[in-house]
C-alpha cells in the first residue's frame, strides 16, 4: 500500500493514518510534518512493524490503534514517547503495555484486555474509558 499523506482531523486535532505496510515511511512523514497525532491501522498484510521507528516522533501527543496490531518488533520503544497524553485501542491487542510508563498520560480509551497493564499506577490519568470490562475491581 502506498503511503497515505492525507491529514485528517478529529476532536484531538490533526492526525495522520499510518498503515502497517507503510509504517516506516509513515513515521518518517509524521516526523517531517511534526504531526501531534497518529492512527495506526491493522498491519495484517505486512510481516512486522518495528516500534523503534516511533523514536523519530518523540513529541507525539496522541496515538490510536485501529484493528489488531500484530508482529511488533521492539515494543519497548513505545515508551520513548514521553509526551503521549492519550492512547486509544479500538480492540484488544496481542501485546502487553504498561500505561504507567507514560509520564504525561491523561486519557485511555480501550477495549479492555489483560495486557493493558498498570493503568491503576498511571497517576496522571484524568479519564479511563473501557469497553468490555468484565471485572469488578480496577486494581486487578
Regions found by a protein language model. Name each.
Residues 2-28, 34-55, 59-97, 101-140:
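Concave beta-strand-loop units of leucine-rich repeat
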Amino acid at each position: 500500500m502506498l503511503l497515505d499523506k492525507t491529514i485528517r482531523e478529529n476532536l484531538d486535532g490533526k492526525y495522520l493514518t499510518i498503515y502497517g505496510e507503510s509504517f516506516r515511511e509513515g513515521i518518517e512523514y509524521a516526523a517531517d510534518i511534526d504531526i501531534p497525532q497518529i492512527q495506526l491501522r491493522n498491519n495484517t498484510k505486512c510481516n512486522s512493524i518495528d516500534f523503534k521507528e516511533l523514536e523519530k516522533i518523540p513529541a507525539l501527543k496522541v496515538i490510536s490503534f485501529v484493528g489488531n496490531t500484530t508482529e511488533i518488533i521492539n515494543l519497548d520503544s513505545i515508551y520513548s514517547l514521553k509526551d503521549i497524553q492519550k492512547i486509544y485501542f479500538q480492540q484488544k491487542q496481542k501485546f502487553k503495555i504498561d500505561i504507567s510508563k507514560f509520564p504525561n498520560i491523561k486519557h485511555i480509551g480501550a477495549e479492555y484486555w489483560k495486557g493493558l497493564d498498570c493503568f491503576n499506577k498511571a497517576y496522571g490519568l484524568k479519564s479511563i474509558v473501557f469497553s468490555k470490562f468484565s471485572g469488578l475491581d480496577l486494581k486487578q
